[in-house]
């Protein structure tokens, strides 16, 4: 039986993610843990997160998990979700400035306020609700139609320097990177565990992914 570890550092809707993973692939062992050995022993790892970036990095540091996450990123399939994706960039504007893990060359920026669509209507921040995702080819999009709608809740967004690392974009109102890819790492700004059948399909794809881009 293959296994997937969900990193528990005290910031994330872990129960919902674990339940969605179990539903997506009942034959996969789902382990919610902060134990470094258990994380490194798993076949795949999910790095979730909800909350403030400074708290995220502080919690990872307190649990001695920063190097663990970096090691996972070099050795096995890793899926970042929401704050977990943002933590993979160099730094974030949140809390003034917060250094992050640096897996992707880029920064986490706050949506400008007021935010207007082309019709002059004010868009709310945080960006909350369903939005379309335009895909770039990747195994985790298998059996998910392009422009499918996923569920978002965020006030900050990723801006990466290398466009080849962008696996998906969404508009609010301007295009922003909502999915990132690099070798065996895939990360999404949206919440697959809240995105109904397309979200479960993405999780199912991750749970059989070998970490290759083709």
Where are these regions (language model features)?
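Extreme N-terminal starter segment of soluble prokaryotic enzymes
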Residues: 1-5
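Structural alpha-helical scaffold elements that stabilize or flank donor/cofactor-binding regions
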Residues: 38-39, 72
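An anion/phosphate-binding loop that grips the pyrophosphate of nucleotide cofactors and donors
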Residues: 42
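Amide-donor transfer/coupling interface in amidating biosynthetic enzymes
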Residues: 107-214
